[in-house]
């Protein structure tokens, strides 16, 4: 696929005028990476929203990188654009999942549908957050708590070591 990798740079970013050219003169997907420039991340997200092009944005973690290993990098990307760039939390989540699935159409993940792999993450607002849901947590800048991670329909983790506990943990019945 055609992807503008690191639209927000790595240790340094391209000028905003070049970002504008890429956004205006191509229809390529645009990858925002966790270890990139936060100001350019905000600019790209806001401009894509103004242009009705949020479907072009995907997220990358870019770890390990020269910045190091960034645990929860994709969740941090979602939080940044939802809390800083005025993107609704549920849309930011879809940018990380469904948009990536559409760009890399050979993947059978990223979209919940019959025939797709059952790779799911159950999350909620973290304890202590002002948010009441995972989406609200993204929008106020809090990383949600993860309570179950399922791969191919099988629970692989029932508690996260890297996120705060959930206000309401998922239960298997």
Residues covered by each model-derived region:
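Solvent-exposed alpha-helices and their adjacent loops that cap or buttress functional pockets
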Residues: 22-25, 51, 95, 113-114, ...
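A short, hydrophobic/aromatic-rich structural module that often spans a beta strand
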Residues: 110-113, 168-173
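His/Asp/Glu-enriched, well-ordered alpha-helical/loop segment
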Residues: 43-125
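C-terminal cap of metal-dependent C-N hydrolases
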Residues: 118-171
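Active-site core of metal-dependent hydrolases
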Residues: 1-68
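Short acidic-hydrophobic sequence patches enriched in Asp/Glu that either
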Residues: 14, 73, 141
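Short secondary-structure boundary/hinge segments and terminal tails
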Residues: 14, 41, 99-100, 133, ...
